Amino acid sequence: MNVLVACEESQEVCKAFRAKGHNAFSCDLLDCSVGHLEWHIIGDALKILSPELRQDNTRSIWFVTSDGTFHSLPRWDLIIAHPPCTYLTITGNRWFNVDKYGERAIERIKERELAAEFFMQFVYADCDKIAIENPIGYISTYYRKPDCIVNPYQFGDPHKKATCLWLKNLPPLQPTNIVEPEVVYYKNGKSDSPWHMNTMHLPKEERSRLRSKTFPGIAKAMADQCGGEA
């Protein structure tokens, strides 16, 4: 299958599909952090979602990967998208209180609407099979409830990170290896996952990049259950 993994610089999902023999490409505004330049597209994923009319009256999706290679495909058979969640996740809800945060909250509300509209571009993409990932948050109200919610600890990685999946013509992701999640406790009694806590001291951009990365177990399950052997 021709697979587009949109909004992914880590290439975790892309690599999993490549391992199954699929023609998968990651796409992000950032360079890939792994190094498979031949599989990575730098740019706006929305610009390569659908085939465009060429001068010879044929339709195709064309792009250049980071290694400088030109590609032309008839269409995507599967799109897996990871739209930015900064303004969509439930963990940021407190910042939308206009009475408390005023203009700052108003600006965040505008950004949230733009983020939701970006998310919906993948929902309406011209592709037979689609999976869109985001944390628990605004999309469940703006669009609809997800088809399934999974955690890394259900796929062999001992971490909690509730991940929602909205699916089109794909089965809900089934757990493959349930393990005990690692948990740390703060003095106030609240708990957290070590992977999340360990990123708090990092610069904003680096923290966001690491927190958005798909864990290997979920990536492999996506490739196995949504793609299978090519």
Question: Language-model features: where?
Answer:
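Conserved active-site and SAM-binding loop architecture
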Residues: 1-230
